Amino acid sequence: MEVKGTAIITIPLFIKERFGEGGLNRWRDALTPEAREVYPAWVLVSSWYPLKEFLTEPLRKMCDLFYAGDLKGAWESGRFSADYSLKGIYKIFVKLGSPEFMLRRAGTILPVYYTPSEMKVVECRKGQGIMQITKFPDMDQVLEIRIAGWMERAIEISGGKQPNIKITKSLTAGDPLSEFLATWK
């Protein structure tokens, strides 16, 4: 499974913003030699990278180093990634719509970042949406949590207030899919 450079480029940016240059260096030093060669200077946003080596493991290292193993770091990293993409390269996408508009397109967004992957929107109405990831061969809890954090911030950016994202089913827990229940005001 692979991840697009646009998804991984935000990790070192997030770490540097939150934990400074020293934190970024500590994190980079903890990575595998292959990942150290790419992070942070050589990430190409249009390239595809092996998911485990360049997203899953680096996120876990970040959570271990700066959050005492708490996956809250993955959530915060997902929020940062949404800011980066939805206020930057995909700004027009958000400006045109509402949280409902954005969530209706969730199925087309996920495969832009992860391949192979599939997401479908089961329900989308004012104040609530249910999205299901039905295909994601190398799902990891740290990735589900990062995706949930991304969704939360995307809802805020598109005008939703007090968003709440719950992972109600999880591929990592043996469920046939990962399900995200999003609510907002």
Tell where the protein language model's regions lie, with residue ranges.
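N-terminal leader/assembly segments
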Residues: 1-68
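A broadly conserved amphipathic alpha-helix scaffold signal in soluble, globular proteins
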Residues: 13, 107, 111, 152-156
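Amphipathic interaction/junction segments at domain boundaries or subunit interfaces
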Residues: 45-146, 163-164, 169
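Beta-rich nucleic-acid/ligand-interaction surfaces
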Residues: 165-184
